[in-house]
Swiss-Prot record:
One of its GO terms (molecular function) is glutamate-1-semialdehyde 2,1-aminomutase activity. InterPro entries: 4pyrrol_synth_GluAld_NH2Trfase (IPR004639), Aminotrans_3 (IPR005814), Aminotrans_3_PPA_site (IPR049704), PyrdxlP-dep_Trfase (IPR015424), PyrdxlP-dep_Trfase_major (IPR015421), PyrdxlP-dep_Trfase_small (IPR015422). The modification N6-(pyridoxal phosphate)lysine is found at K266. It holds the Pfam family Aminotran_3. Belongs to the class-III pyridoxal-phosphate-dependent aminotransferase family. HemL subfamily. Transmembrane segments: none annotated. This is Glutamate-1-semialdehyde 2,1-aminomutase. Homodimer. SUPFAM superfamilies: PLP-dependent transferases (SSF53383). Its EC number is 5.4.3.8. GO terms for biological process: protoporphyrinogen IX biosynthetic process.
Length: 434
């Protein structure tokens, strides 16, 4: 990448740890120097030298309307003119709450936060307060933010108490977290048989978007719902990535499962800093000031994010919106898959709604990965080569083999064809080099 980016990265490292404010941005997984972006519009982002890239990161999901959508920008400007934040209730947060509760059947009440991490952290505290239990269950490869309870991996045995995955997380704290393999119904049954009456909640990405993209089996979700109901545990769907991305009603509608609590991310504010958690009324009424579970935030429900979200939902609720985005994903993924086959590249893919995943497997017998171990067994070197080849051709993918891709309504057929052509060129080079 250009000397300009190297200079900017060096400058950033002077006062920002690692030069970034979120680790994946550092390109550690793919190597090289991160590209410093300057502006964005529609399906494109532009670096500091005004080079154009077709963007499939979309600020990690929320830009489903594309960047700088005129309606959203107009709403944000109007909100800013009226004052950035009040520290009081506003009608705008009520409007967003009404919209979400009207759309998502499992959400009877909802509380705004300022991030997805706050949403998952608060949902877990609420589940513990509601049940009077301490233990929580999560799954390998699922990411739910950086709160201490969730930076935990499985112990030496599948049903062992968890071990911290980050320095600074006390082992005594991590012992309350049980980590299971994703997409494994039997592991859920075994866990509840051993710990059932101690489990406060199970938190899960209903479709995993942090080990690339894994769409689990229906049996996995049916088992989760049945075991949580039987064991009196709260089922939490973390739809920070999938909410309003795979469909208007999220992944829960795809599987026909109603969780007890659900977490949303910045998509509900059209990309501004915001999150939310909601669910059954009897659980949500345990939150202060109604109940004894404390949760608060000075900027929760801030007017900029709320008014941006209201503007965004006007488009999301138009009939056919999600079908249009899904058609774009299908066109792109099928085109890339055909190009890979043409050049003998062993590529597997997944897709649903506005999300897609690409996996470079090591042999023809290997199918689409179904869990974290199978994702880690993929050919990361080939992904890294593919990533940089696409970047050099003006295609911006997530700089990690463990991240999902996102489509927007603003991606054109020309964008998709250019992306497929770039992939074809990169695959040709990869094939010639092997």
């Amino acid at each position: 990448m250009s000397t300009k980016n190297e200079q900017l990265f060096l400058q950033a490292k002077k006062h920002i740890p690692g030069g970034v404010n979120s680790p994946v941005r550092a390109f550690a997984g793919v190597g090289g120097t991160p590209v410093f972006m300057h502006k964005a519009a529609g399906s494109k982002i532009y670096d500091t030298e005004d080079n154009e890239y077709i963007d499939y990161v979309g600020s990690w999901g929320p830009m489903i309307l594309g960047h700088a959508h005129p309606k959203v920008i107009e709403a944000v400007k109007a909100a800013a003119d009226d004052g950035l934040s009040f520290g009081t209730p506003t009608t705008f947060e009520t409007s967003v709450a009404d919209i979400i509760c009207d759309i998502v059947p499992s959400v009877e009440m909802i509380r705004m936060t300022s991030s997805g991490t706050e949403a998952t952290m608060s949902a877990i505290r609420l589940a513990r307060g509601y049940t009077g239990r301490d233990k929580i269950v999560k799954f390998e490869g699922c990411y739910h933010g950086h709160s201490d309870s969730l930076l935990v991996k499985a112990g030496s045995g599948m049903l062992d108490i968890g071990e911290p995955t980050s320095q600074g997380v006390p082992a005594d704290f991590a012992k309350h977290t049980i980590t299971l393999p994703y997409n494994d119904p039997q592991a859920i049954k075994d866990c509840f048989e051993k710990w059932g009456d101690e489990i406060a909640c199970v938190i899960v990405e209903p479709i995993a978007g942090n080990m690339n993209m894994i769409v689990p089996s229906q049996e996995f979700h049916d088992t989760l719902r049945a075991q949580c109901t039987q064991g009196g545990a709260v089922l939490i769907f973390d739809e920070v990535m999938t909410g309003f991305r795979v469909g208007l009603k999220g992944a829960q509608a795809h599987f026909g499962i109603e969780p007890d609590l659900i977490c949303f991310g910045k998509i509900i504010g059209a990309g501004l800093p915001v999150g939310a958690f909601g669910g059954k009324r009897e659980i949500m009424e345990c939150i202060a000031p109604m109940g004894g579970v404390y949760q608060a935030g000075t900027l929760s429900g801030n007017p900029l994010a709320m008014r941006a979200g209201i503007a965004m939902f006007e488009d999301l609720t138009v009939e056919g919106f999600y079908e249009g985005v899904a058609d774009k994903v299908t066109y792109l993924v099928e085109g890339i898959q055909a190009a890979a086959h043409k050049h003998g590249i062993k590529l597997r893919s997944t897709k649903l709604g506005g999300m897609f995943g690409l996996f470079f497997v090591k042999d023809e017998a290997t199918g689409v990965p179904q869990n974290f171990d199978e994702v880690t067994a993929c050919d990361m070197d080939k992904f890294n080569t593919f990533f940089h080849g696409m970047l050099d051709r003006g295609i911006y993918l997530a700089p990690s083999a463990y991240e999902v891709g996102f489509m927007s309504s603003k991606h054109t057929t020309e964008d998709l064809d250019a992306t497929i052509k770039a992939a074809d060129d990169v695959f040709a080079e990869m094939s010639a080099a092997s």
